[in-house]
């Protein structure tokens, strides 16, 4: 049984110290595509946490029975099954959000973070550790996603969760929206500034 300190490290380390987007530069595509609104970013975060945690758990449980030659296929089959489950739940209970997320829920199957943790960690670790590692990496991914979405939605439209925060000029207020922040390239710049900020606070993450 894994000790509490180790589990805490697995849960919290990916959020700041070993963030999958900010340090490992993984999962960038969805960070560009689903961060125009906080709502979609949060839903995507929960979807990735669910898929990463349970794929890690199931792969770890059967890791000793998976032939090395087909391990990637087995991993993808498990991940794909979980992604289909998430997609069907969204279609049933949050159809509007499902439409907004479009193909990007399905593309969780090929998300480097999910595949990377399955191969690098779950195949070599105990089930509980693997499950917690999946949650931690999902949280780390989500922290960047939500941060980017917060900035993009607020500056781009003056809203958060679709509710007006800054009254726009068009509605008789003072705020002029900046449509640039609603375009995908803006997410690149925001992520770049976040990475710069993290590495300023943590110089040990700067590549030599």
UniProtKB/Swiss-Prot annotation:
Gene Ontology molecular-function annotations: oxidoreductase activity, acting on NAD(P)H, quinone or similar compound as acceptor
First-tier enzyme category under EC: translocase
Main location: membrane
Membrane disposition: Multi-pass membrane protein
Reactions listed under catalytic activity: a ubiquinone + n Na(+)(in) + NADH + H(+) = a ubiquinol + n Na(+)(out) + NAD(+)
Domain of life assignment: Bacteria
Gene Ontology BP terms: sodium ion transport
InterPro entries assigned: NqrD, NqrDE/RnfAE
A single GO cellular-component term on record: plasma membrane
Transmembrane stretches, start-end: 42-62, 70-90, 103-123, 131-151, 178-198
Keyword vocabulary terms for this entry: Cell inner membrane, Cell membrane, Ion transport, Membrane, NAD, Sodium, Sodium transport, Translocase, Transmembrane, Transmembrane helix, Transport, Ubiquinone
Enzyme Commission numbers on file: 7.2.1.1
Quaternary structure and interacting proteins, as annotated: Composed of six subunits; NqrA, NqrB, NqrC, NqrD, NqrE and NqrF.
NCBIfam families for the chain: nqrD (TIGR01939), PRK09292.1 (NF006777), PRK12405.1 (NF009070)
Functional description taken from the UniProt entry: NQR complex catalyzes the reduction of ubiquinone-1 to ubiquinol by two successive reactions, coupled with the transport of Na(+) ions from the cytoplasm to the periplasm. NqrA to NqrE are probably involved in the second step, the conversion of ubisemiquinone to ubiquinol.
Family from the record: Belongs to the NqrDE/RnfAE family.
Protein name: Na(+)-translocating NADH-quinone reductase subunit D
Organism field: Pasteurella multocida (strain Pm70)
